[in-house]
Amino acid sequence: MNNNLLIIAGPTAVGKSDLSVDLAKKLNGEIISVDSMQIYKYMDIGSAKISKEEMGGVPHYLIDFVDPSKEFSVAEFKDLATEKIKDIQSRGKLPILVGGTGLYINSIICNMNFAESDKDEEYREELEKIANEHGNEYLHEMLKDIDLESYNSIHFNNRKRVIRALETYKLTGKPFSSFKAKNSIYETPYNIYYYVLNMDRAKLYDRINKRVDIMFEKGLLEEVKNLKAMGLTDDMQSMKGIGYKEVLYYLDGKISLEQCIEMIKQGSRNYAKRQLTWFRKDPRAIFIDKDTFASEEDISSKIINDIINS
């Protein structure tokens, strides 16, 4: 059994889904989504979830399976994805990771080891209180002396991750960063083919803006109203995603519809920028500038030739 793993990554709205379905059909592959928002049920429009029609008969996994009221960790994702990769490979097919959540991708290809089993709810509540009273930056500074690597790699506004890092140190006496890959971060159990799609920034931003407009045309407001009626609130993990938190602000009368739309567009553009920064840090990633190819077919052919000739 070969241990090949194809990855099609890239920023939001760059066009990963269409290419990956085409590749799956040509390479006898099955797709595992690596998108931290498409995991949730009932959240189709705001997450730009691929439709059954767009899947084109290609099996897709780890989409639409988590209740949005529940917490879901990277460690849980890694375990599920790893099992699915084994299953796909055991049937003689090629697993293809598709998405833009860099941490999800790294959890798999770097075989990251998460210390997720132990939790200290009382300490978490204490840290939440500190953050609420003094701010996220104050909480983030607490990491500096005990885990400089996590301090430098975790953004101060990622409160959940900062708290997890502080909690891990309290429980284990070891830095949270030490629970990542045991050896080099670039060592992987797979034979990977890692591609990152990109395009001219102005074109990408235009695609992002148009995608947001289409989301509203498709009924994003109604989708969030339904989620709100189900009891979902802005402090839940799922509702912190771009597109959902802003619509909640609008529905709560905190901002106008115009402000809501512009905030989603700006947030999505900023997210795309962060995604590209993340992918550029990995020397294994091969960037594909879509503007230099005449067609999607040419991109597909290039990737297939790389795999065949490797």
Swiss-Prot record:
SUPFAM superfamilies (UniProt xref): P-loop containing nucleoside triphosphate hydrolases
Record keywords: ATP-binding, Magnesium, Nucleotide-binding, Transferase, tRNA processing
Signal peptide per UniProt: none
Site feature: Interaction with substrate tRNA: T101, R124
Keyword Transferase: yes
HAMAP family in the cross-refs: IPP_trans
UniProt name for this protein: tRNA dimethylallyltransferase
Organism in which the protein naturally occurs: Clostridium perfringens (strain ATCC 13124 / DSM 756 / JCM 1290 / NCIMB 6125 / NCTC 8237 / Type A)
